[in-house]
């Protein structure tokens, strides 16, 4: 059979490579595994239960949950009865939650735990369409999701489900994924079966997938990149193991020993910083060897371009030092897929040197999501780029530098928002990404900035903040940065120090810095970070250099609405929240 709709995936897996561990998650400290046949049985019973409860094709169902097999069960149960699911972030604000559930007219909600249940239940009187909330964990007084599977077993509507399945076309709506932009209300991105199927089939070039592989999943499944790759895993018979939480990833990696996982650059940065901090604690020959290997890795070039002597040294570094990095990831990693934000080239280099290929990709929710990706095909990796454009997708660079995309991955449109759909997809079918980029070497796409985030100084010079911020974040001393200076004489920055790294650094220098405030106001810290900024300034044009900066005593956060759930900066809100620091920078002639 061929897979043309998402509902074909598990039947295809059952036919081609039935698995004993199609999905797995820890329950009471033990891995509970679901075979392909069990997954299909649960999905069917859920579909029967939903139909018995009065859910019908065209309805919407919401999901707010951590990653777990139940997420997949609900997703596939909805898909095969032509019900679109609306997945949302657990960290969603109350305003955005009310807006999305109201606009999409969600009838049933499925939530992971008591905290989210209480949050939604409190809003229920304001949500006229919401009829029932089911939980995955047992919550006193709440309906449990298994009530639906039990009802489905008692009244199996297999004929009804098969009848609906037979009417579902690849072009039909599969899901509505809300994107929380840096301004305004969230937009509901409508993706069809074909949008997602075409995307995961085109991403098979990412690496040589194998039905003996295991994937560890921890990025939220409502993030379209993790979700699309989860469909790809099912298609290739890769077993999906769900991490217990972000805090247990290190233990779960050693336990599961996966060949692949998806991550965002920020998590890789934290892994790298932790490795470097541990290396800094070593002494004598061990410390010297660690830094020798690290500096070797940071100079890594593909295809042996550094010559035989470098490659010979790298072999030794891999045996002595980098082998321990691979062990920490379970010792089986073939590829790490990175997306959602720009990956620092130095991270790509050092992990590749350590035989841990980190493959950066690029796309948006509106493009299902992948447009381009570094991959295992010959000569299809280039550090500092997001790789080559995937099969059946076209990219062109507009006159103003904006990246335009056309192909089967481009969304159906924004839900109940034809005006914004027309703004984003032009009459010729080109989707306007809002990102600025160039094509290097005739095939590699490189992102240089967000179109809307570029600003002018009072001298009329254009500043590309994201590029400068990424350079600043390459420093081990800097956790976050935001470049400012619109309509001012010069560019400056808000800098959030890497508090844990600086505490270790301070201890080695016998400096007592207990609190974040002490770190942000300490002259020694400011002086050391100024050295980092000056080094970065040497790589920038004169008008781009950071003339002044303020150290902040806390990180930008989703809770304070300063970042989207995808960790994009909400610049206006950050400026408002740090007005005092801004005024200190620009309160002179």
Predicted ranges, named:
Residues 115-170, 275-324:
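ANL superfamily adenylate-forming
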Residues 389-457, 474:
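Conserved ATP-binding/catalytic segment of the ANL
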């Amino acid at each position: 059979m061929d897979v043309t709709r998402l509902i074909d995936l598990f039947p295809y897996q059952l036919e081609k490579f039935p698995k004993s561990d199609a999905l797995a998650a820890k329950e009471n400290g033990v891995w509970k595994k679901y075979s392909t046949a069990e997954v299909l049985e649960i999905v069917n019973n859920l579909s029967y239960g939903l139909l018995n409860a009065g859910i019908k094709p065209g309805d919407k169902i919401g999901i707010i949950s951590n990653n777990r097999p139940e997420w997949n069960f609900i997703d596939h149960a909805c898909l095969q009865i032509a019900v679109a699911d609306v997945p949302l972030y657990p960290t969603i604000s109350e305003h955005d939650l009310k807006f999305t559930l109201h606009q999409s007219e969600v009838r049933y909600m499925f939530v992971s735990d008591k905290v989210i249940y209480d949050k939604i239940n409190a809003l229920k009187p304001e949500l006229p369409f919401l009829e029932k909330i089911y939980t995955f964990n047992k919550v006193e007084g709440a309906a449990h999701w298994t009530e639906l599977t039990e009802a489905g077993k008692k009244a199996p509507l297999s004929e009804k489900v098969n009848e609906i399945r037979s009417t579902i076309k690849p072009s039909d709506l599969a899901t509505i994924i809300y994107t929380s932009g840096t301004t305004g209300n969230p937009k509901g991105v409508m993706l069809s079966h074909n949008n997602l199927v075409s995307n995961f089939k085109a991403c098979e070039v990412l690496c040589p997938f194998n039905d003996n592989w295991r994937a560890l999943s921890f990025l939220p499944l409502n993030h379209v990149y993790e979700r699309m790759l989860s469909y790809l895993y099912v298609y290739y018979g890769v077993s999906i193991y769900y991490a217990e939480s972000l805090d247990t990833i290190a233990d779960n990696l050693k336990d599961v020993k996966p060949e692949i996982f998806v991550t965002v650059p920020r998590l890789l940065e934290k892994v790298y910083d932790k490795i470097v901090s541990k290396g800094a604690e070593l002494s004598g020959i061990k410390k010297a060897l660690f830094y020798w290997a690290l500096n070797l890795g940071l100079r890594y070039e593909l295809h042996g371009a550094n010559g035989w002597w470098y490659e010979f040294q790298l072999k030794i570094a891999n045996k002595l030092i980098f082998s321990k990095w691979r062990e920490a990831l379970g010792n089986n990693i073939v590829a790490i897929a990175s997306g959602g934000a720009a990956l620092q080239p130095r991270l790509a280099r050092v992990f590749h040197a350590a035989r841990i290929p980190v493959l950066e990709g690029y796309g948006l929710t509106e493009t299902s999501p992948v447009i381009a990706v570094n991959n295992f095909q010959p000569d299809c990796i280039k550090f500092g780029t997001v790789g080559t454009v995937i099969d059946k997708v076209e990219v062109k660079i507009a006159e103003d530098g904006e990246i335009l995309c056309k192909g089967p991955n481009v969304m159906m449109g924004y839900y109940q928002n034809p005006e914004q759909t027309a703004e984003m997809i032009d009459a010729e079918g080109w989707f306007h990404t809002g990102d600025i980029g160039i094509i290097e070497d005739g095939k590699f796409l490189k992102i240089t900035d967000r179109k809307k985030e570029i600003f002018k100084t009072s001298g009329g010079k254009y500043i590309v903040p994201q590029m400068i911020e990424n350079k600043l974040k390459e420093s081990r001393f800097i956790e976050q940065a935001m470049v400012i200076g619109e309509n001012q004489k010069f560019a400056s920055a808000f800098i959030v120090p890497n508090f844990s790294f600086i505490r270790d650094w301070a201890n080695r220098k016998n400096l007592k810095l207990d609190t974040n405030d002490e770190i942000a106001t300490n002259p020694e810290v400011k002086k050391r970070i100024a050295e980092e900024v000056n080094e970065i300034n040497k790589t920038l044009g004169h008008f781009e250099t950071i003339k002044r900066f303020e150290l902040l005593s806390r990180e930008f956060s989703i809770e304070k609405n300063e970042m989207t759930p995808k960790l994009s900066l909400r610049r206006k809100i950050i400026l408002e929240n740090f007005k005092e620091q801004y005024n200190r920078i620009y309160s002179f002639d």
